Amino acid sequence: MDKEILNADFDTHPETVDTEEELSNYLSEIAEEIGWIVIYFNSLEDQIAQCLREMMLRDAYQDERLDVFLAEMGYQVKARALVHLYGQAIAFGASRLPTQDLIDLEKALTEAAAIRNGYAHADWIGLRTEAYIKVKTRSTRNGVMHRYKRIDPEVAQMDVDFISSLRHRLEAVHELVLNQIYGQPSTKNETDVQN
């Protein structure tokens, strides 16, 4: 469960934990999942780059000049470019991937970035009671807002599983699209694409 609280509403912010021992125990319990989130997210980003190479070139290793551009692109730009390339293939009839599957994939890729950023930029040392962590601070016309997310080992494991499974889903979609473009039978089935 997330909570968004105005900075000025001090009384409504979750209380910080009482002891260093409590903080240390919590961090020890969740550190492995944080690491897996970073590892799987980085792998997902690499997979997106590989898919871009394959969508743009006949031989992904033929022209390393593309890597000059990919190295300068952030995750969101790479993900959006890949989704647009898939959309172009659909629009021109080269792929029969259902538009809703593409929309769902785009949303999932965006959600993966939000999850990863929440973990990467969270105030882990500022742990609050009931496992609330400040994951985002933003400025609005109403003042500064802090977003807290309850992250216990179970939630963290669900986030690990989501990002890990998204990479497999992307591989399935990519194989399906490429096989449709080049007229080859796919080894992936529709359930792989949707999950």
Tell what function each PLM region has.
Residues 45-49:
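N-terminal signal-anchor transmembrane alpha helix
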Residues 2-39, 50-76, 80-195:
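Acidic, Ser/Thr/Gly/Pro-rich intrinsically disordered interaction regions
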